């Protein structure tokens, strides 16, 4: 139909806007780092971290990406020191992918446990993190849970509920728009820190772990971002979608 064709044309244009940047060789530093991690199946083993990854990092195209990659590796190395791989996998077999239970067992934070879980291929977990502005600072997708590459994410994500209420766990079963046969369980958590002390600014970081879920029962209907979400009855929509509404 003409409506379907127009929607497809709009979607292609929307995606091409990002592809054009990549073709010019100026992909965002965050995307460079995520592409590097994707090539490693998102896994940095304790052996990798101990052996050093500088040779791989040096091959990234931009200095900004190399800086982000080094910061990511430093953080992963600190996580591994507190949550060593062998002991963490043994604990995981007992608790399941519960970041709060794992954090309690190792004296770590839930954010550290989430990052470790996301780096274990067998868990099949996605992970997103954001800063206090809500901007996504890390994006590891999960099957059937597409993440926005540009712009803001869905305001209904529990990630943002957690951002507004640090140190409180949020768990939900969700269904992504366009994924009627797939559901996920998400766990979100936020923390604050004061790197400049009492009189400095409070910084917030939130994370949302995305886990496969095969259970039945009610779900929260969410999307990726408004522009590419076809849910026509969403109360949180901030801008029109370029796709035809579901059921139309």
PLM feature segments, named:
Residues 1-248:
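Conserved binding/catalytic microenvironments
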């Amino acid at each position: 139909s003409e409506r379907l064709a127009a929607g497809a044309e709009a979607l292609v244009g929307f995606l091409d806007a990002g592809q054009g940047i990549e073709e010019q060789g100026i992909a965002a530093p965050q995307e460079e780092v995520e592409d590097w991690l994707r090539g490693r199946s998102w896994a940095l083993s304790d052996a990798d971290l101990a052996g050093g990854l500088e040779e791989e990092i040096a091959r990234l195209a931009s200095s900004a990406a190399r800086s982000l990659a080094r910061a990511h590796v430093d953080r992963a190395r600190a996580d591994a020191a507190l949550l060593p791989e062998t002991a963490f996998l043994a604990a995981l077999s007992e608790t399941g992918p519960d970041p709060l239970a794992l954090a309690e067992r190792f004296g770590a934070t839930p954010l550290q446990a989430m990052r470790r879980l996301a780096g274990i291929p067998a868990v099949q977990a996605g992970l997103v993190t954001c800063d206090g502005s809500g901007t996504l600072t890390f994006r590891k997708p999960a099957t059937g849970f597409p993440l926005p590459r540009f712009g803001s994410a869905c305001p209904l994500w529990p990630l943002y509920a957690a951002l507004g209420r640090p140190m409180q766990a949020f768990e939900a079963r969700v269904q992504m728009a366009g994924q009627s046969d797939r559901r996920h369980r998400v766990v979100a958590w936020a923390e604050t820190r004061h790197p400049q002390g009492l009189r400095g600014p409070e910084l917030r970081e939130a994370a949302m772990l995305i886990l496969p879920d095969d259970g039945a029962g009610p779900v929260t209907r969410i999307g990726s971002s408004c522009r590419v979400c076809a849910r026509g009855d969403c109360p949180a929509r901030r801008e029109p979608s370029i796709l035809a509404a579901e059921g139309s």
